[in-house]
A protein has these predicted regions:
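Hydrophobic faces of well-ordered beta-strands that scaffold small-molecule active sites
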Residues: 17-21, 42-45, 74-79, 98-100
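Active-site beta-loop-alpha junctions enriched in small/polar residues
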Residues: 23-25, 47-49, 79-83, 103-105
């Protein structure tokens, strides 16, 4: 199920979704245990620095396996991606949601970058 569909479903069910970053196995485990206790869906967010630390493939495998092991509904999200290239890598790795942060660019470059990310997302998600 796509993230937008999940969010609509959760809204109808009067559920909130916890969106939180994880940086390693230990923080991921804590998030999953807490979400499991209250049976809450979770959006597992990764930043460039956490991807650099864990490796993209390893981070995705840990997140997916964790959601499965804890029997949780959830997704993987790129939080404050700094480049179109990183967004592409994350989408190729199976992220269901991405966010680009082009705030340090000029307004024109920000709009151009955001449009590229939207185009990529529509293809993958």
């Amino acid at each position: 199920m796509k993230v937008q569909e999940k969010l609509k479903q959760f809204q109808l069910e009067r559920k909130a979704i916890l969106a939180t970053n994880f940086y390693n196995y230990e923080t991921l485990k804590g998030i999953l245990e807490a979400a499991s206790r209250v049976q809450a869906p979770v959006m597992l967010q990764l930043t460039r620095s956490s991807i650099d630390y864990m490796g993209l493939k390893r981070a995705v495998v840990l997140a997916r396996q964790g959601l499965e092991d804890y029997r949780l509904d959830g997704c993987i999200h790129l939080d404050h991606g700094g480049s179109v290239e990183l967004v592409q890598r994350c989408l190729d790795a199976g992220f269901e949601s991405v966010m680009i942060d082009a705030s340090e660019k000029s307004m024109e470059e920000n709009i151009e970058t955001t449009c590229k990310v939207v185009e990529l997302s529509l293809i993958h998600i």
